[in-house]
Amino acid sequence: HRNKFEKRGFDRVIDVWGADHHGHVHRLQSALDALGLDGSHRLEIVLMQLVRMMQGGEVVRMSKRTGKSLTLSDLLDEIPVDAARYFFNSRAAETQMEFDLDLAVKQDSDNPLYYCQYAHARICSLLRKMEEEGVTVPEQADLTVLSEEEELALVKQISLLPEEIIGAAADRDPSRLNKYAVALCAQFHRFYNACRIKEAEDEVRDARLVLCRAARQTIYNVLIMIGVEAPEHM
């Protein structure tokens, strides 16, 4: 840490530790204070609660003493990389996580990652089909024609992304992006089920297509920030 502050010019250092090391936080900050590096203010330590693995509704028992453990390599033999990244990012640091191995591989709406990736693929499919049927998906449209409750709610949800990014960074809580992604996809599905697109008048249809494009791009952006793929086909 001294090297980071003195030699490498860091203004602030953020360490991520397991909660079982909480007793060392004050010691390290005090040591940096003694070196004149203002560790109490410039060193921030985020304590992560431990993860409890679940499978078949039961806890997967692990023990350092007996040597029974589950490594990340072992985990990735059981579930996709995307699932590991999404689920590990789905809880705030101070919240204990129950990692459901069965849920992580489910391919239905119970799995939040599948739910979000499916929403992205669904919009991609919709836009492709419109183009195949001779309907040009416009870059811009008059969005003032959107007046349905589900349309306006989707517009509002899309607009919240910058605020969520800033909040996630300020709170050191990237799980906010997971929650936002699920809320956005849920709102898109409500919009899609309530508002006809192909059969609508041209002006309304174009506005709804632009809204779909905006939703797709926003879902894509969030999934990429979380570190998972945004598939166009599922």
What are these regions (language model features)?
Residues 1-234:
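Non-catalytic interaction-recognition regions
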